[in-house]
Regions:
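C-terminal flanking tails of non-heme Fe-dependent oxygenases
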Residues: 1-9, 202-211, 218, 225-246
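An N-terminus-focused feature that recognizes amino-terminal "leader" regions
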Residues: 1-154, 172
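Eukaryotic intrinsically disordered and solvent-exposed regulatory patches
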Residues: 12-13, 160, 201
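Extended non-catalytic domains of envelope/secretory-pathway proteins
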Residues: 18-21, 179, 186, 243, ...
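Acyltransferase donor/substrate-recognition loop-hinge adjacent to the catalytic core
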Residues: 135-177, 191, 196, 221-241
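Active-site rim elements
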Residues: 175, 248-249
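Beta-propeller domains
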Residues: 175-223
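Conserved small/polar residues in nucleotide/adenosyl-binding loops
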Residues: 251-253
Length: 253
């Protein structure tokens, strides 16, 4: 489904890669009981490696996978969790130029998000994505530094990459959508980022079925399968009813 992230060439803005995408930076989670979520992540081998300087936000990491748990009461994440329950409320793409990617996304019809930015805190541009979740654009990574050096304090050594359970990178993030909405979201990613479909599945079970379009970014490092139910009895429909909307579903590492 694309090159192993470390083998892919550095991102450049081009006709093929108009946003200069370069992989995932993080996934942000919200939970009515953030401590319980933290315990689950630690059982999976993630470690709390940094804490936000002024907010109840913790960075968990394993290998190159960054999971942010946002427990800040007065935040987008808290409001999102109050509406949807435990969820992935945001994700971030690495891009060559965050300002350029944000402005291009808005010009192509994406809905901007303007959040609260505290003193001495980075302002990371974002748009509304699947189910009203946020999609951030990050260009501060690798040789250009780290967003975590600015907004977070490391709990131990700087920028560690613990490898507790053998997870190294985020392979893909699944989206579950309402029936009839798959083409809309596939078109959204194609229009903004030039994602392409690399595989189509039509899975029919004894009682229910689903279709899935597996999309990948021009850089080959971001993969998003979009799932749609074929009826109202499937597990996907159950997820959507319980969640009260379309969602960032499973994160696969």
């Amino acid at each position: 489904m694309g090159p192993f992230p470390h083998d892919a060439p550095p991102a450049e803005i081009s006709a093929h890669n108009p946003m200069g995408t370069d992989g995932f930076e993080f996934v942000e989670f919200a939970h009515p009981d953030p401590a319980e979520l933290g315990r689950v992540l630690e059982l999976m081998g993630f470690r709390p490696v940094a804490r936000h300087r002024s907010k109840a936000v913790t960075l968990y990491r394993q290998g190159d996978v960054n999971y942010i748990v946002n427990a800040e009461p007065d935040s987008f994440a808290a409001a999102f969790a109050a509406e949807h329950g435990p969820c992935a409320c945001a994700m971030a793409f690495r891009v060559k130029d965050a300002k350029y990617a944000y402005e291009r996304a808005i010009a192509l019809g994406a809905e901007p998000y303007i959040g609260k930015v505290g003193p001495m805190e980075l302002s990371i541009p974002a748009v509304r994505g699947i189910g009203g979740s946020l999609l951030y654009f990050v260009d501060r990574y690798g040789d250009k530094g780290s967003i975590y050096d600015v907004d977070f304090v490391w709990t131990g050594e700087r920028d560690p990459h613990p490898e507790q359970a053998g997870l190294y990178y985020l392979d893909h993030l699944t989206h579950n959508v309402h029936r009839g909405r798959m083409d809309f979201w596939a078109g959204w990613y194609e229009k903004l980022f030039n994602f392409r479909e690399i595989r189509f599945f039509n899975i029919e079970g004894k009682l229910t079925g689903l279709i899935s379009r597996a999309l990948t970014s021009p850089c080959g490092k971001i993969r998003i399968p979009i799932n749609e139910s074929l009826d109202d009895k499937s597990q996907i429909e159950e997820y959507l009813r319980e969640y009260k909307g379309e969602e960032i579903g499973r994160a696969h590492v």
